[in-house]
Amino acid sequence: DIYKLYIGEDGRKVPGSIHLKPTFLQNLVFFFDYQLNWMYWRYFLWNFAGRQNDIHSPIPGDIFKGNWECGIGLIDRIRLGDQSDAPAYLKENKGRNHYYMLPLLLGLIGLFFQYSRDRRGCWLNFLMFFMTGIAIVLYLNQSPLQVRERDYAYAGSFYFFSAWIGLEVRALISRLVRSKKVVPC
């Protein structure tokens, strides 16, 4: 059981049972490392940074299965180690997509652009992004080893982030107009 990896042998003994009760700190580590990092941010970055492959690994930290991978060598080597020695079935996996973090960067530019122009709208979009993403993680409290990937639960969050990608286009046009390289229509 994945949850036992986070408890280890350090949990508190439950009287009359062989089970260990996790401490509050162990629960927090599980929440941040597994539920937020592995079950939310990994899916988020698959869509906006890139995906290593489509092989499911229920174990967080498996460097060859199901991670996000952007295609920028330095970043990928720091996170996952040298992948050049990986077997061909991993290198040539059809689920492998490298977006070089461009959608992520465009979305962040759109976020800052909206914040500078319309703080109220930005906060609304951020709250919807949060409520359909991280708040769903809190609400669902998914246990490890699900029957299938549950990334569809976070689709709303990805839509709201995509709105910021669209706003980046507006930021780019605004910048070009100010620099007099483009005449506004």
Model-derived regions, located:
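Aromatic-anchored segments of alpha-helical transmembrane domains
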Residues: 129-138, 185
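Hydrophobic/aromatic-rich transmembrane helices and adjacent perimembrane loops
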Residues: 146-170
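Membrane-interface catalytic loops of GT-C/OST-like multi-pass glycosylation enzymes that act
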Residues: 93-96, 118-121, 138-155
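Signature aromatic-anchored transmembrane alpha helix within multi-pass, membrane-resident enzymes
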Residues: 115, 119, 167-185
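Hydrophobic alpha-helical transmembrane segments of polytopic
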Residues: 106, 125-132, 160
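Transmembrane alpha-helical segments
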Residues: 104-111, 161-173
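Membrane-interfacial loop-to-transmembrane alpha-helix junctions, especially the N-terminal start
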Residues: 99, 117-129, 182-184
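Lumenal/periplasmic acceptor-binding loop at the mouth of the active site in multi-pass
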Residues: 1-111
